[in-house]
Curated annotation (Swiss-Prot):
Protein name: 2-C-methyl-D-erythritol 4-phosphate cytidylyltransferase
Similarity annotation: Belongs to the IspD/TarI cytidylyltransferase family. IspD subfamily.
UniProt gene name: ispD
Role: Catalyzes the formation of 4-diphosphocytidyl-2-C-methyl-D-erythritol from CTP and 2-C-methyl-D-erythritol 4-phosphate (MEP).
Entry's transmembrane regions: none
Keywords: Isoprene biosynthesis, Nucleotidyltransferase, Transferase
Catalysed reaction, written as an equation: 2-C-methyl-D-erythritol 4-phosphate + CTP + H(+) = 4-CDP-2-C-methyl-D-erythritol + diphosphate
Classification via HAMAP family: IspD
Source organism (scientific name): Methylococcus capsulatus (strain ATCC 33009 / NCIMB 11132 / Bath)
Amino acid sequence: MSTDARFWIVVPAAGVGKRMGADIPKQYLDVAGKPVLQHTLERLLSVRRVTAVMVALGANDEFWPELPCSREPRVLATTGGRERADSVLSALTALAGRAADGDWVLVHDAARLCVTRDDVERLMETLEDDPVGGILALPVTDTLKTVENGTIQGSADRSRVWRALTPQMFRYRALKEALEAAARRGLTVTDEASALELAGLSPRVVEGRPDNIKITRPEDLPLAAFYLERQCFE
């Protein structure tokens, strides 16, 4: 594999965040004086080795043009799809002709605004010579139960369970083909690693930070603001 592989970032941002119950998509909600997506893009653009960030937007996104990062030279945009995998695939298709087959693509959730530059760079450095790639993840510390109809059926072995975070980093061609194959089979993939797993590959995990949270519910907003403030003093 070429040692000249570049690093691209894909940010699926076409969702509306129904669980937030807000009037605007959650990626545009204010946290500590800035929209969530602005925070996220600033963090990603702080990584020097990133060639460009491709953002997959909703078809009628009226908020994007107002975002300062939308005018950054390294920020590109395309129209996303209904599901996360559709948006990622749209972004990868938009990168055709720019990204080489062996280039790395890091897919990052728009709503993970607390990701740190150190975590992204460590993911790159750890996996850049890996044949498959991998993801930021966090070992599970809680006891996990399998439940059916409200009744506990068993306990998971938490020593073997990690919580998937983002970015998730894979070769351009391998990721695109894995997502296309899953779509042809009608399979739902909730993250990029799942698509690679279905293709018979074994992504690696790189331990990330517990404050790399995803904005999902209203109570996540003040928590994210707290983490952002705390990170300023590190």
